[in-house]
Amino acid sequence: MIQIEIQNVKSRLIGDLDPKIISALHNKLSAEVVGSYYAQQRNPYWDGKKHFFTKKGMAFATGLVWMVREVLDKHHIEYEHVDLRVKPKEQSSLPLHNVTLRPYQEQVVNDSIEQQRAVIRISTGGGKTVCMAALVGKLNLTTLILIHRQEIMQQIKETLERILQVPVGMVGAGVVDIKPITISMIQSAHELKDFLPTVDVLMGDEGHHAPCETYWQVAQECKNAYYRYLWTGTDWREDNMSILLDGFAGKKRWDINASKLIQDGWLVPPEIFLYDFKHERKARKGISYSEIYGAEITNNYERNKLVVDIAMKAVKANKSTLILINYIEHGENLLKILEKVYPEAVFIHGSTEPEKRLKVLQEFKEGTRKLIISSNILGEGVDIPKLELLITARAEASTIAAYQALGRTLRLSEGKTKALIVDICDSGVKYLESHTNSRISVYSKEPLYKLVPVQNISQIIL
């Protein structure tokens, strides 16, 4: 009989397996590398895949045990589990304050503790951080939460301290303050060398980032982390590396989409105006994508003026408005036009001083500031319940980014009955048109998203 020897980070098979079964496992626990076709031309001996099962030692990430079992079951191989993990001693749970868990949140927390590790998707605005806090409090063990952005770190810290009423440590942005519950920017993980082996509960927020190398290095250093969870508010990764999410934290256990949350009254329904912006100039042969983006998006005065006109219509209607862009130059171009008609306009991005970014964001949350231009720092993870209108001006191709951006607007807020989004849908240029189609495909997956094609500003009803 085959033994599945399970440890916190790595597991392995012990026993004699037919080489064909080993090959089946090697193939199952793999993912095709994007762009591998070209690399294979240089190295014909490579199959173009990244493998997560070693043939020689029959080792694999513990989160993939369920996939190994599927292969063994398919080939009628008998096996038994040998669990070498040491479960942390149970502690009294921390009481929760200032929050009442929704039914699905209670189910997520209880199931996650029972399963010990999980990948959990709760659509943006569904109270993912509240679930995280409740799970941390119920386990009440040494916990590390990995994040990748300063604004998210501060937001999670404030939420955990409000709900659990205990101090929460932070590592990142020049701060090293380690406590039994600590939030760390993944870029600052080198500061945690002595803390990592003591961690019982390892979590990753915005879990679609987990396939990055640093996440994996930290996960492997947390040798005693019995409980492992990844949280995300977006659709699963759009490349083939979703298997890395499973390897980090186990099987995908929960998938609560936006339409379910809207139906149950936990999010407001969105109305998405798809503004058809026709580009007159045709892309020349041989021109790069960055050159197309620069000419047709970043430096396109007509398009930028349209974005500003839509924003000003919203300001006059007293709607709090966020304009999302990708590149600093684009934001600066928009700001130059906007400042002429709205001097209070502000543009924040990754290079903006942290104090200014947090101040502007706080003013926006409080409603004292009505209009912001922002790069991707506000496109993901940041909670802005009062946001009423989102203008996506960045011609984004990523479906994950589209999910995240839309989620900025769906949160409940007093007096808010629906979310408004204007997506500048570029047509007439091949690359940009394909990006438009990608975003529309994301919106179309949610049955309660209302899509409204428009061709002029008067059709945008605020």
Where are these regions (language model features)?
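Conserved segment of the helicase C-terminal RecA-like domain
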Residues: 408-439
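Conserved interdomain hinge at the start of the Helicase C-terminal
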Residues: 287-326, 332-337
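A short beta-strand element within the Helicase C-terminal
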Residues: 199-200, 373, 380-395, 420-423
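Inter-Walker segment of RecA-like/P-loop motor cores
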Residues: 161-194, 360
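Post-DEXD/H (motif II) to motif III coupling segment of the RecA-like Helicase ATP-binding lobe
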Residues: 208-273, 443
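Walker A/P-loop
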Residues: 115-136
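Conserved helicase ATPase core of P-loop NTP-dependent helicases/translocases
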Residues: 154, 166-177, 322, 332-336, ...
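Conserved pre-motif I regulatory segment
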Residues: 52, 74, 80-121
